[in-house]
């Protein structure tokens, strides 16, 4: 290693100019085959899979701010598949499998760390519900099991098993639970897409949707008009507003979702620990910081500002689980905007507008679905609207057909 450093130090060409991973923006073309609205994880993943596996490269990603700067940058990077319904378990399990291979596929380290997730049960009713979830997960290949207090103590020795009002009775242990660097995921997909000819246009806001009859023909942006054959909507918390511009309604309500992080400390917590009764989850990052999150704010609001009220609530509940955390200092707090459905499942697939495809309703669980969402949306677009089997249960029509996919019981702390 020292000889390699010496060689570079004596080289006249070092440091050398290197090509940027993501090319600088260019002028908008007048026409694209596909326009993807939203430059977050889902948007760039869809573009990546369109280009790599379907040969569709005349694609423009339009992002009103910057790459991965919305909910992709604001989530707490939890990856899991221990959901309640067969539809949900199959979908998120497929996403976990893709996450496991992303670093190799990108040749780019997304810092994927599979450390397991532990969800605490504080009542007999929750224990029964967890037993059902464990069996559903096992049936579809997930590594999930119900464990007792002794096993919990061995997994997380620092956890307080006897909070004053809510003693821990059991836990749902999900071995596939993991984390990854959310910005690395977005950049990996964007790099792979742009290297194959996809254009990423940041600071480009879509202000209107162009239609002829019931068919989308293009979009209007702050940089001009673009004609296109298809549009993919992937704008997270602003999904209902954009759909309204296209001429239809989505059954979504936007809520702020807050999280916070402490000063870094020595490693003491390997698994991700959550409690739906306490409305709180805690994890330790690779840098030693403690990330604390919980449920969405109780009021609908398009705001990404944090609040003292939720800060006090989350900190109190985190200290119930780990009392020694009262000695730590809080570094920062932030919020994102979630687009919640009534059944806590996404809306994916066709819309009432021809060639206008929906990727919405991700609430607090969008990051963990990024790879499989991009894969299935790319297949949907490339096939001209043939909905993949995996996302058929998440169609918009399920609300009018009373075929909801109820995952509310599996989103511990609304996550």
Where are these regions (language model features)?
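Extreme N-terminal leader/targeting segments of oxidoreductases
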Residues: 1-34, 52-57
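Flavin (FAD/FMN) cofactor-binding and adjacent substrate-gating region
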Residues: 2-10, 101, 113, 122-196, ...
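Glycine-rich Rossmann-fold phosphate-binding loop(s) that bind the pyrophosphate
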Residues: 39-42, 64
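Glycine-rich FAD pyrophosphate-binding loop
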Residues: 51-72
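Dinucleotide-binding Rossmann-like beta1-alpha1 core, especially the glycine-rich loop
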Residues: 76-158, 279, 309, 317-322
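Central helical "cap/lid" subdomain
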Residues: 221, 225-270
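Active-site lid/adjacent beta-loop-alpha segment flanking the redox-cofactor pocket in flavoenzymes
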Residues: 264-357
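C-terminal catalytic lobe of FAD-dependent flavoproteins
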Residues: 319-415
């Amino acid at each position: 290693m020292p000889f390699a450093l010496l060689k570079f130090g004596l080289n006249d060409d070092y440091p050398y100019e290197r090509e940027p991973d993501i090319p600088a923006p260019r002028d908008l073309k007048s026409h694209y085959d596909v326009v993807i609205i939203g430059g977050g994880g889902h948007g760039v993943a869809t573009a990546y899979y369109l280009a790599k596996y379907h040969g569709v490269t005349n694609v423009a990603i339009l992002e009103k701010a910057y790459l991965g700067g919305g909910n992709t940058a604001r989530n707490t990077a939890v990856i899991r598949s221990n959901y309640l319904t067969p539809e949900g378990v199959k979908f998120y399990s497929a996403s976990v499998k893709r996450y496991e291979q992303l670093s190799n596929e990108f040749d780019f380290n997304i810092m994927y760390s599979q450390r397991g997730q532990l969800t605490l049960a504080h009542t007999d009713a929750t224990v029964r519900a967890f037993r059902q979830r464990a069996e559903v997960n096992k049936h579809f290949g997930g590594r999930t099991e119900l464990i007792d207090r002794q096993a919990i103590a061995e997994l997380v020795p620092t956890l307080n098993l006897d909070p004053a009002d809510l003693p821990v009775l059991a836990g749902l242990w999900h071995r596939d639970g993991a984390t990854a660097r959310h910005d690395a995921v977005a950049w990996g997909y964007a790099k792979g897409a742009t290297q194959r000819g996809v254009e990423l246009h940041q600071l480009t806001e879509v202000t209107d949707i162009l239609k002829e009859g019931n068919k989308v023909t293009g979009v209007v942006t702050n940089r001009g008009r673009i004609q296109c054959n298809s549009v993919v909507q992937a704008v997270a918390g602003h999904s209902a507003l954009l759909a309204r511009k296209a001429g239809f309604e989505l059954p979504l309500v936007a809520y702020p979702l807050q999280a916070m992080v402490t000063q870094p400390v020595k490693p003491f917590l390997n698994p991700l620990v959550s409690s739906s009764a306490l409305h709180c989850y805690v994890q330790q990052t690779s840098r030693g910081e403690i990330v604390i999150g919980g449920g969405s704010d109780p009021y609908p609001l398009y705001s990404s500002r944090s609040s003292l009220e939720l800060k006090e609530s989350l900190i109190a509940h985190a200290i119930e689980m780990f009392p020694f955390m009262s000695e730590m200092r809080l570094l920062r707090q932030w919020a994102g905007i979630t687009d919640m459905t009534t059944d806590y499942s996404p809306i994916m697939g066709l819309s009432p507008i021809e060639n206008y495809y929906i990727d919405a309703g991700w609430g607090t669980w969008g990051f963990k679905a990024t790879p499989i969402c991009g894969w299935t949306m790319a297949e949907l677009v490339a096939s001209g609207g043939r909905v993949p089997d995996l996302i058929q249960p998440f169609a918009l029509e399920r609300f009018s057909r009373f075929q909801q996919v109820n995952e509310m019981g599996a989103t511990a702390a609304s996550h």
